Amino acid sequence: MNDNNSCKLTMLTRRLENMTQEYGQPDLPVPFLNGDEPGKLKLPLSERHEDVDYLTKEQCIQYFNGYSIHLIPPRISS
């Protein structure tokens, strides 16, 4: 398995572990596709979906890039 596939597998495994943990157990950081964890890049860890509201634009962009999320800009109608 190449390194990129290994990082994707680790990311998916962490997500599954977090979804199936007992209530009250801390979530594990989900690594980016390159294997880095958000904390390594000094990004705030997201423990709840509400935490996203407190990220700066730059932090959001770093998260999107880390998880390879590409947004399509809206079309401008004339």
Swiss-Prot record:
Name of the protein in its database record: UPF0612 protein new22
Native organism: Schizosaccharomyces pombe (strain 972 / ATCC 24843)
Domain of life: Eukaryota
Family indicated by similarity: Belongs to the UPF0612 family.
